[in-house]
Amino acid sequence: MKINKITLFCGGSGSESIIKYFINQKNIQLTLLINAYDDGKSTGTLRKNIPGLLGPSDFRKNFSYLINLFSDEQRNLKKVFEFRFNKKISINNFYLNIKNSKNLEKYIPKEINFLEKEIKKDILNYLLISIKYLKTTEINLIDFSLGNLIFAGIFLKEKKNFNLAVKKFTNFITTKVKIINISMPRLI
């Protein structure tokens, strides 16, 4: 069978249907070229407070399109990444609870408990890194994406290397799709 190589330019939305179509074709080798210039909602707040961070939501959304929903592990991971806080939570309060592993179910979807032990540990570690970095701010987490906070933690842990953060974030999902960041950080 001949393999067709398809490259798709995309941002955070608008390409879900076509991505899902291509990943279900056995004769397609898909590459996603993703721009990361989103600056709305939690992404905008994170970009404002973490210098050099591009839009994590553009990658998070595309990763969620690639998740194999026939796998319980991946389905639970998607729920964790896509979770949005629906009430006011101070960054400092969230930090203290994550740090002490108290009341996690009050803040994080229960699906995190069904992930492999190492994945759960990594996610909580990345969350702790991003929240610790942001805890001096007055950020309120209402409508924040948990996946964006996880990505921000990876970015900070990897010494603000966005492309390495993309690679590390991709390691959470099972995919054959090649993902390339085509964004440039601000040059000024």
Locations of regions flagged by a protein language model:
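Short internal beta-strands
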Residues: 30-37
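Extreme N-terminal starter segment of soluble prokaryotic enzymes
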Residues: 1-6
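Electropositive, gly/pro-rich neighborhoods at or near active sites that engage anionic ligands
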Residues: 37-188
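Glycine-rich Rossmann-fold phosphate-binding loop(s) that bind the pyrophosphate
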Residues: 10-11
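Short, conserved loop/helix-junction motifs that constitute active-site signature segments
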Residues: 23-28
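Short glycine/serine/threonine-rich phosphate/pyrophosphate-binding segments
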Residues: 14-19
